[in-house]
Amino acid sequence: MADEQFPAAVTALEEYHNIEQQMAEPEVASNPDKMRKLGRRHAELGAIVSAYTAYKQVKDDLEAAREMASEDPDFAEEAKRLEGELPAAEEKLRTALIPRDPDDARDTIMEIKAGTGGEEAALFAGDLLRMYMRYAEKRGWSVTVQSENTTELGGVKDVQLAIRAKGTPAPEDGVWASLKYEGGVHRVQRIPVTESQGRIQTSAAGVIVFPEADEDDDEIEIDPKDLKIDIFMSSGPGGQSVNTTYSAVRMTHIPTGITVNMQDEKSQIQNRAAALRVLKSRLLAMKHEQEAAEAADMRHSQVRSLDRSERIRTYNFPENRIVDHRTNYKAYNLDAVLDGDLQAVIDSDIQADEADRLANQK
């Protein structure tokens, strides 16, 4: 029977069961791309279905207890207890029904670029790279370095990563659900290894993140005529050759000017496929940003330049202090954060975002 108070939950339950039926069909089960898309939606609806099932259970038990209360005093006590539980179950369901970012369950492409500060900025970009790789390791995610330019001192001029979860995670456990808040300028304050007089220097690195598109994502179509593809020899740290074939690919999307370099894979064909997937991810992110702008509901803005004034977070080494300027989160465990203990910082952004979404629903 339909629930007049929560019709959206009933619709979600119906879709949830419909998806389960589709996933059981042999032709769907043998199609990994189709299964991934259905699995992602199934996981997204799962939170609603779980909250709705719990709410219905409390509500039905309460109605039954009230009917039996006139015959058995014990049921009157049970009804009183359930009356106390019902508001919390309702609130949990209302929260679950608040629309999530549809990309939360997606994997993520991340770019880290050294900004103002010369060699020190490149060294800090390397610190951020290690921090995110350690964080991904703690979360059980895989990290693929798709392209990287380093300095002689071991710093990072720029690096591109693909960070992916195992299987099909629930939206709240997706890579994008956590890492989407990392986009912006990260500022560091410390005494550089190149500083002979021991003065504290401020420099910065920029982080750009966007959800990774599926290989068969039909939301973005790219005309081959709009692509300019250059082939070159892969190179490693210090300009060393990775292999002796021209397998690296530079793919340019002519209408937007977006350029993707890919040399991580072993063959030119693999690098072309990987570059095309990253390009689709960037175009998908651009499309979603435009849609959000039109709806006056922009996502957390990311770095548009590497100016220190656009900082989202400051890493102060002398004080072992980290500050997130969007949420006013502050802690004195910078060493642990740079070793991948980033969850508390990210949680502060998630909680602020959820509070905003709740406020917009009221």
From Swiss-Prot:
Molecular function GO labels: translation release factor activity, codon specific
InterPro entries listed in its UniProt record: PCRF, Pep_chain_release_fac_I, Pep_chain_release_fac_I_sf, Prokaryotic/Mito_RF, RF-1
PTM annotation, UniProt: Methylated by PrmC. Methylation increases the termination efficiency of RF1.
Subcellular location: Cytoplasm
N5-methylglutamine modifications at: Q240
GO cellular component: cytoplasm
The entry's keywords: Cytoplasm, Methylation, Protein biosynthesis
Primary location class: cytoplasm
The keyword Cell cycle is assigned to this record: no
Any one Pfam family match given in the protein's UniProt record, by short name: PCRF
The keyword Transport is assigned to this record: no
SMART domains noted in UniProt: PCRF (SM00937)
SUPFAM superfamilies: Release factor (SSF75620)
Domain of life: Bacteria
HAMAP family linked: Rel_fac_1
Function as written in the Swiss-Prot or TrEMBL entry: Peptide chain release factor 1 directs the termination of translation in response to the peptide chain termination codons UAG and UAA.
Family statement: Belongs to the prokaryotic/mitochondrial release factor family.
Protein name per UniProt: Peptide chain release factor 1
UniProt organism field: Bifidobacterium adolescentis (strain ATCC 15703 / DSM 20083 / NCTC 11814 / E194a)
